């Protein structure tokens, strides 16, 4: 494992994966290809927190309104392509509260605002439709 003081550019994702080739089924995981980058940070990492929801971002917003302390929020949006679970306001809150990034198995919106936010954002794609606020879902 690299020294904590090493600059990020000196240690690539591939290097990190090389160090963990013997781990099978442990805590080390890599996301499959298919997620697009929308945030202001292209590379990010951190302890994971989770939200599971379907076309309702109430719990996503609630999570990102708390101190992130460098964590990454992974949102299981069931792969819905009909409603955006993260937009510009939510991304700005994530950056303001110290989250490293958000990974969405679903869609996001407000591409220009996401790109301007100081947080990493990965998602399946863009869709302009907002969510319906029902307060449903699960959060770790």
Regions found by a protein language model. Give the residues of each.
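Feature captures the catalytic cores and cofactor-binding loops of soluble hydro-lyases/lyases
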Residues: 2-140
């Amino acid at each position: 494992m690299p020294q904590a003081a090493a600059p990020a550019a000196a240690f690539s994702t591939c290097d990190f994966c090389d160090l963990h080739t013997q781990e099978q089924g442990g805590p080390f995981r890599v996301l499959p290809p298919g997620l697009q980058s929308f945030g202001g940070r292209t590379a990010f990492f951190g302890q994971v927190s989770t939200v599971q929801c379907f076309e309702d971002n109430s719990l996503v917003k609630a999570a990102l309104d708390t101190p992130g302390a460098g964590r990454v929020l992974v949102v299981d949006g069931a792969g819905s392509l009909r409603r955006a679970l993260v937009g510009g306001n939510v991304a700005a809150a994530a950056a303001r509260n110290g989250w490293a990034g958000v990974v969405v198995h679903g869609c996001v919106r407000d591409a220009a605002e996401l790109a301007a936010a100081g947080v990493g954002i990965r998602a399946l794609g863009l869709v302009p439709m907002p969510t319906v606020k029902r307060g449903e879902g699960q959060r770790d």
